[in-house]
């Protein structure tokens, strides 16, 4: 069996990539070879800092010493639930990310208070922005904001962002490159607001609406009216009926449809009704049913047999993470 000393650099780099950031830095003290490997650009393309309570001083050090132009994606947490005296993400730090990390494409922020951080301070190179349990101000996504902000943004994930409301949704229209939108637990968005917002976001190709107060029927109606080119839909089945699902019939570009439980409504379409609607979707290739309790049941057999051209996935909902920031 080969020892660590005998392993080639490429294998050691692969091993080091699975280590948390703190451990990567510690092992750089083992020997000159490991120090050189830890400094390799490849190892710092994707960085996850959500495991730590990261003080701004430490973050600045990481930014200057290790990340810089190497960084492609970054996950980091804030101090939203740590009290008013806790340090917060600053506009200066986010601006520095944009200046020192010109290759940064994806930024995921968790439990961060962004109410005093202008959206203009985010790196302009971002293609994906994820906000998980974050606070934002009313001005953050206001329609009258500078239209040149985040010109390359293609995907935005808003997961349990309590301040997000109809006005914010309509403000997303200034991101002309936006193609993917995920709304998770954004309970302030209304049916009227969703319809008005999607009317101006007709170029979206992927939409997920999960755990919101909106009924599935009203969501699908808005999609059928305004998102004729949508390719992927994922939504919670709360308030879904057979007539509501039928509004998707004939959707010309839809390739993937996911209906996510738990099953809580007697109006839920039967497997036969779901099959009937799916057969009218010419490009449908993936049908996923999550958390409906149909695994191994007759419903699964009906759908698999009736949709031979589709990948039919029937499974339980994945277990929710025990990590409070996820």
Swiss-Prot record:
InterPro entries: F-box-like_dom_sf (IPR036047), F-box_dom (IPR001810), LRR_dom_sf (IPR032675). Residues 1-47 form the F-box domain. Pathway: Protein modification; protein ubiquitination. One of its GO terms (biological process) is ubiquitin-dependent protein catabolic process. Transmembrane segments: none annotated. LRR repeats lie at residues 51-78, 86-111, 113-133, 161-185, 186-211, 212-236, 237-261, 266-291. Keywords: Leucine-rich repeat, Repeat, Ubl conjugation pathway. GO terms for cellular component: cytosol; ubiquitin ligase complex. The keyword Repeat applies. Changing residue 63 to H: Found in a renal cell carcinoma case; somatic mutation. Interacts with SKP1 and CUL1. Substrate-recognition component of the SCF (SKP1-CUL1-F-box protein)-type E3 ubiquitin ligase complex. Mediates the polyubiquitination and proteasomal degradation of CAMK1 leading to disruption of cyclin D1/CDK4 complex assembly which results in G1 cell cycle arrest in lung epithelia. This is F-box/LRR-repeat protein 12. It comes from Homo sapiens. The lineage of its organism: Eukaryota, Metazoa, Chordata, Craniata, Vertebrata.
């Amino acid at each position: 069996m080969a020892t660590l000393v005998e392993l080639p650099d490429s294998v050691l780099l692969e091993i080091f990539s699975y280590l948390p950031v703190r451990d990567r830095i510690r092992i750089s003290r083992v020997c000159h070879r490991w120090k050189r490997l830890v400094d390799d650009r490849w190892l710092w393309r994707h960085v996850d800092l959500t495991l730590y309570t990261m003080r701004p001083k430490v973050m600045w050090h990481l930014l200057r010493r290790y990340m810089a132009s190497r960084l492609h994606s970054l996950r980091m947490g804030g101090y939203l639930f740590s009290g008013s005296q806790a340090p917060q993400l600053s506009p200066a730090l986010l601006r520095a990310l944009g200046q020192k990390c010109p290759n940064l494409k994806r930024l995921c922020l968790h439990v961060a208070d962004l109410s005093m951080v202008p959206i203009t301070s985010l790196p302009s190179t971002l293609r994906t922005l994820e906000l998980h349990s974050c606070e934002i101000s009313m001005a953050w996504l206001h329609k009258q904001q500078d239209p040149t902000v985040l010109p390359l943004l293609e995907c935005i994930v808003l997961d349990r962002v309590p301040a997000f409301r109809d006005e914010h949704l309509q403000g997303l229209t200034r991101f002309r490159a936006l193609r993917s939108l995920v709304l998770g637990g954004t309970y302030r968005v209304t049916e009227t607001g969703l319809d008005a917002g999607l009317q101006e976001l007709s170029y979206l190709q992927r939409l997920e609406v999960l755990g919101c107060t909106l009924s599935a029927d009203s969501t699908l109606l808005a999609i059928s009216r305004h998102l004729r080119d949508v390719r992927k839909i994922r939504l919670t089945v709360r308030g879904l009926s057979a007539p509501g699902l039928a509004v998707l019939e004939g959707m010309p570009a839809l390739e993937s449809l996911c209906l996510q439980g738990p099953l809580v409504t007697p109006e839920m379409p039967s497997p036969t009704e779901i099959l009937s609607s799916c057969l009218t979707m010419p490009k449908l290739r993936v049908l996923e049913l999550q958390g409906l309790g149909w695994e191994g049941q007759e419903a699964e057999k009906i759908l698999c047999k009736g949709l031979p051209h589709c990948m039919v996935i029937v499974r339980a909902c994945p277990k929710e993470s025990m990590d409070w920031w996820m």
